[in-house]
């Protein structure tokens, strides 16, 4: 037990001594660092002098690493304020960034060392041209003179200031107004390669993808921007606007599939109204609205919607098909055949070919005489109504009763008789209603029937007796009896 106490006491004394030793060593090390710091700084300054910084900046400029070059030039000037060439190169780099005021100051500083230097004077003139061109391009953009604005940006500003973010973003805006969305995507790609967190570039690139109807990629750009700045108003507007459009479109499509056609039609209209300029997406919305309108039997609405779709994409086969269906509803047979024939030539879809056959049949039927119309009756008229109409019109247009306009009366009378020959026969009437061809159905009284054929030549008299029947008179009235 006594030995244990002795050992414990010795252990405590040893640990305490070790702790004091470590504290002393740390204190000495800290003092050494403080004493050596000025020497280290001096050595650093000697290791990278102004000339070396200038040379490194020159190499960075060659590979277009302008930000690195600017840092080294600033350091070189700080190390040697009399290094005139550093001012000249810094002025040039600042001009590249379109930091025109700072650039001009550096040129002027260089000219204090090298008064009248032709290269500096030339670049200073280019600076003024670029600055003026950028201001002009901005004004032209505001006044919607897009072509001229692009010319100033491309041919002046970006020639003398190729690293000018302001000019690059202005160019993207001009391309967006010109609806050159692929060009806008390409240009913003260069900007984001240099600065992946450029919020304006993310917004513009997202909008370009949006207007190409590449909504997933557009959404990703908006989301990245909002992660960097959750309160960015334009990014929020673009992001939530896209979400609303997608939601409304899906609802319209779902309701169309469920047969809720009236609701679907209204939702398609609302989706289109959210962004009337979004043609790449609206072409599909107009087509959806056209289909729903045709299913509702709204021929005029369907025609208008499909016209809008075809104004955007004249080769959209399904829009041609649906417009043909809308024209069938409007009884524009020739227009329907034209649209459906064009669609069928570019598609093997059996539904389109069936619709074309239906349209061609309707067109053919429309060119035949409408026997119902000639007798002034409906297509659902009974046989007794047909006979009654025939008797009335035959009496009205009998040539003997129309001596003053005999030729017209004979033509009308012939049509009336032909109409009765078709509609008074159940089989012929059914075939006519189905659109089938009947021999001589539309010509010269139908089936060779001529109420004026019989005894006697021209000028014969026509007599009708309606008592107990309606036989032809002395002029050989074809023997129709009831």
Curated annotation (Swiss-Prot):
InterPro entries on file: DnaJ_domain, DnaJ_domain_CS, J_dom_sf, TPR-like_helical_dom_sf, TPR_rpt
Swiss-Prot/TrEMBL induction comment: By tunicamycin.
Gene disruption phenotype: No visible phenotype under normal growth conditions, but the mutant plants die rapidly after challenges with the turnip mosaic virus (TuMV) and turnip vein clearing virus (TVCV). The double mutant erdj3b and p58ipk is male gametophytic lethal.
The keyword Repeat appears for this protein: yes
One GO term (biological process): positive regulation by host of viral process
Tissue-wise expression: Expressed in flower buds and flowers.
Pfam families: DnaJ, TPR_16, TPR_8
Keywords assigned: Endoplasmic reticulum, Host-virus interaction, Repeat, Signal, TPR repeat
Primary location class: endoplasmic reticulum
Tree of life domain: Eukaryota
GO cellular component labels: endoplasmic reticulum; endoplasmic reticulum lumen
Mapped TPR repeat ranges: 50-83, 85-117, 130-164, 166-198, 199-232, 245-278, 283-316, 318-350
Compartments in which it is found: Endoplasmic reticulum lumen
Residues in the signal sequence: 1-42
Domain J: 370-436
Disulfide bonds: none
Function, in words: Plays an important positive role in viral symptom development and is required for viral multiplication and pathogenesis.
PANTHER family xrefs: DNAJ HOMOLOG SUBFAMILY C MEMBER 7, DNAJ PROTEIN P58IPK HOMOLOG
Subunit record text: Interacts with the helicase domain of the tobamovirus (TMV) and the tobacco etch virus (TEV) replicases.
Name listed for the protein in its UniProt record: DnaJ protein P58IPK homolog
Gene source species: Arabidopsis thaliana (Mouse-ear cress)
Gene: P58IPK
